[in-house]
Every structure is written in structure tokens, then in C-alpha cells.
Amino acid sequence: MRADGRARRKGRRAGLIVLAATALAGCGGLGGPAGGTSPLRTVTGGPARAAHRSRPKRHYPSFPVVNGLGTLGPRWHPVVTVRGQTAAWIAQRDGVTMLRFDQRLVRLVLHAGSADPGSGPWQYGDTIRGSERRRLAAAFNAGFKLDTGAGGWQSGGHVAVPLTAGRASIVTYRDGTTDIGAWQHGIPTSQPIASVRQNLSLLVDNGVAAATVNSCIETCWGATIGNAATVARSALGIDANRRLIYAATPSATPATLAQGLIDGGAQRAAELDINPDWVAAYLYHHGRGLPEFLPVIPGQYGVAGHFLAPYTRDFFAIVER
């Protein structure tokens, strides 16, 4: 019995020593290198388990997130994110405000106005509604009135005004990608087409402004209020990385608008509408109820309803893919 008692006491002392050593090792008390593996853990033969926690899956909003315009300047800075990635940037050069869109994250949608082109079998009508509204990032004006002879208009296989060869054309394909070029001169490709909006000739081609931007202002680039050369103007371009660039200004000549686009990286561009009543762009902040609109162009007059209510003229929306 005494031998058994002594054995039990020795066993208890050995256990206490092991526990104490383990505690010291956990506190770094065994003199091992900082952050290193404790020698005791290796001796005990237990599996070394790294303190690893799986990161929780990140959940992104189901709508584009607008970060605000910030201070406008020549450097591009993010204004819209989609699923945590930058989908739109903003910059301003020589008074020309530009929005640049990543077509991998967003797509362009051509809307028919209630008067221009008017009622018809259009998939996208005179206001942004339903699921499109929930995915809305931006919207802006389209081109001249269709009765001015500036070009054709087509959507969903239906033609409001016949397309004209050589006209600057904003072509959106059914896969959601958009290209800009002269009709039947490089575009369209063989892909199925969703919509085409034509307006005048290319303002920018191969990164160079049209030769007429200084010499043929009203005849080539549209009649202005009071025959002024410097008025509100807008355009849509595309850069070498297939990003779309909307450009607008409350006061510019065609040459100034073209140069702003070129400085922003545009390779090709079509002029859109001009004069202050018809040049407008918005970003949209999502919350409860109707999206809140954020005017993009300093000094813009804006349009009634901000494209969230029926509008008479056609326009473009930028929506999350």
C-alpha cells in the first residue's frame, strides 16, 4: 500500500510539472523564439493546429453603390461600385465632365421617349421602372430629335427611323456590350443587335477630333440657341479598353468637347444632344423607395422627372449586369 501511495504521489507531481510546463510554453516562458512553435508541443506529439478562421463570405448590395461625386478634377476617381468592384469613374478636364463605365459590370440601355420616337413596340419606354430601376447606376440624354435628319433609331428589331450608312452609331448588342463607330464602316459586327442610336458623324475617330469641329460648327454639329458656338453639349465615346465615356459640359464648342473626350482616352465618339434644356446626366443612390438622383454636370438644367418619370425624349440608362 505504501509503495502504491508513493507511486500515485509521483504520478501527481509529474502531471503537475507537465501542466506547468504547458502553461509556461503558452506564455512564451520556455524561452522559444517569439512567434515560434513551442518545443513542448512538438514533444507531446499532438497535431500542430494553426489558429485559422475562415473569413465570412462578403455580401454585397443587390444594387449599384454610388460613392458621391467628390471634387471634380482631371484624374479619374471611382463613383460607382458593383459587387465591390469599381464600375464607374468621374473626371473633369477643361470644363468637360466625364463618366467612364466598365462594360464588364454595367451595360447601356436605349430608352424610347413618349414623343421621340413615340409609342411603339419598344422594350424600354419613356421611364426607368421595375427591375431595371433597382439595378440603375446612371442615366443621360441621347441624341438630336429624330426629325432633324441626324440619323436613325432602332430597338429590339423595330425601326423608328431607318439607319444611314456612315452616321456615328451607338450600337448595343444583345450580349449587353456597346460599340461606337460609323455605320457600315467597321460596325456592326455579325452579333445580334439590341439597339442602334445614330447622331451626325463621328466627333472623334481613332483618337482624333473631326476636321470640322472648328470650321463647320452649326451646319455639321447642330443648330444652337441664339446661333452661339459655345453652348451645352454632350457626347458618348469608347476607349481602347471598351469602356464607355459620357462627356458633357454646360458651355463648349465641338472642339472643346472632342478634346475633353480625347484627353479622357476616347478612341471614337458620337456627339449627343446640345443646348441646355436637353443635356443632363444623373447618378442614382439606392435606399428605400425611389432612387435618389444626383446631378452630374455642374450647372445642368436637368430634365423633368430625372428619367424616373415619363420623359418625351429618348435617353440612355446604365444598369448593373
Regions from the language model: what does each represent?
Residues 4-16:
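Bacterial N-terminal signal peptides that target proteins for export
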